[in-house]
Amino acid sequence: MDTALTTEQHEIRRALRDLLARYGGPGAIPAAVGTAEGYDPALWRRLAGGLGLPGLALAEEYGGAGCTAAELALACEETGRALLPSPLLATAALAAPLIAALGTPDQRAALLPRIADGTLTAALRPPRRLARHRPRPHRRQPR
């Protein structure tokens, strides 16, 4: 198995590191997690619009880049390296592949293009019957 990065993967890493060095960093973390969203929405728009991160591993028919999970894992690794609070992992690595694999055609058509362009974030929730406690809606309050 060849574990060397491709030229495209090196470019993804470089572009993401450059962007995070400019707009992220340890000083930006408290402000980002203090928002109602729990992340910096302006930086998320840059990651989505400029780099296409949420749609990196989504099929082109849904507005994604059509890359593999390896490129998405690389993006998640870089955002983790920068300690970036963002919806990338939950949205692009967890929810989007499940919607792509298990969603109805209507669900895929309605949700995946919005995930790919960054206008929709998503997360997973266990079915209520599997939860050990009574889940209730929670909206994060700004600090």
Where do the PLM segments sit?
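Amphipathic, small/basic residue-rich leader segments at the start of a protein or domain
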Residues: 1-85
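Non-transmembrane alpha-helical segments in soluble domains
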Residues: 17, 99-100, 112
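Short alpha-helical functional segments enriched in proximate histidine and acidic residues
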Residues: 19-23, 98, 122-123
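A general structural signal for well-ordered alpha-helical segments in protein cores
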Residues: 44, 72, 92-95, 108
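Conserved catalytic core of Hanks-type protein kinase domains
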Residues: 47, 78, 101, 114-115
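Short beta-strands and strand-loop turn motifs
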Residues: 55-58, 89-92, 123-125
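Glycine-rich, Trp-frequent "lid" loop and neighboring beta-strands that shape
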Residues: 65, 105-143
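N-terminal glycine-rich flavin-associated loop
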Residues: 86-105
